[in-house]
């Protein structure tokens, strides 16, 4: 029986590289690509099947920044499959990133320069906006849409006889100081991306606490500094091209500069091969690339408090109740 893998954000960047790498590891998989743009997803599916003709690749339309789209997409997944073996929660945004020049010039002459470039800590601010659902866009896209997706797909994911895995694309940029239980959407702050990724780490801990006994395990990863649409929003592609020699040099000191989506997907692929029961739920798995170009995975203990994680999880459950009432009313009117 083919293992079924659902990947959000599968049509570009890390998600696209992950698809190719998983099929290279096991072309007997059924990959389900959850994407907003059907034509783009179709082109990806055709390319994957051309290189891996024995695989099965399907598409479900889903926009994780739109909760009705998430629910509709999940219903379609439940119609097609009886179980999911892997759910890669990879889709994400960093809208309108602004470089903090003061922090940049202060940091570049400090002893923390390598850490600053590896994590972008304090370097980037973003201008968030409100979605049609009434949420902060970064919070809904990076975290809450995925949370609703997990809740919708629980019947396909929870099988104690044969565990399923949730695998998140988080970030080294996840900082405790940018998250607050009083403002989980980071509406009052300027670093919603960092906040959403720290929230991802918290949710990961809570999901393991609440679902391991049901056969569902969750892990978080960081792809490192990768050239994707996300980073091209910070600086134009030609600037990154000019910086590549410097980045390759930095690799000898900081292995977070994975650069390519293929390298960045290393931890995501590594987790595909692990027994989830053997993994530490308080560890984030980091993709790394050495100065000589060798890829590897390193575990890093997360700066998370389990009680805070549980409180955050309960807050999300309350938010979910409100959302379901709104969606039911909308469906009734339509």
Curated annotation (Swiss-Prot):
Tissue specificity note: Most abundant in ovaries of pregnant animals.
Keywords: Endoplasmic reticulum, Glycoprotein, Lipid biosynthesis, Lipid metabolism, Membrane, NAD, NADP, Oxidoreductase, Steroid biosynthesis, Transmembrane, Transmembrane helix
Catalytic class of the enzyme: oxidoreductase
Residues in the Cytoplasmic compartment per record: 251-334
Entry GO CC: endoplasmic reticulum; endoplasmic reticulum membrane
Active site, per annotation: 193
Signal peptide region: none
Sugar-bearing residue positions: 37, 178, 229
PANTHER family named among the record's database cross-references: 3-KETO-STEROID REDUCTASE, 3-KETO-STEROID REDUCTASE_17-BETA-HYDROXYSTEROID DEHYDROGENASE 7
Protein family: Belongs to the short-chain dehydrogenases/reductases (SDR) family. ERG27 subfamily.
Subunit structure: Binds to the short form of prolactin receptor.
Name of the protein in question: 3-keto-steroid reductase/17-beta-hydroxysteroid dehydrogenase 7
Organism: Rattus norvegicus
Gene: Hsd17b7
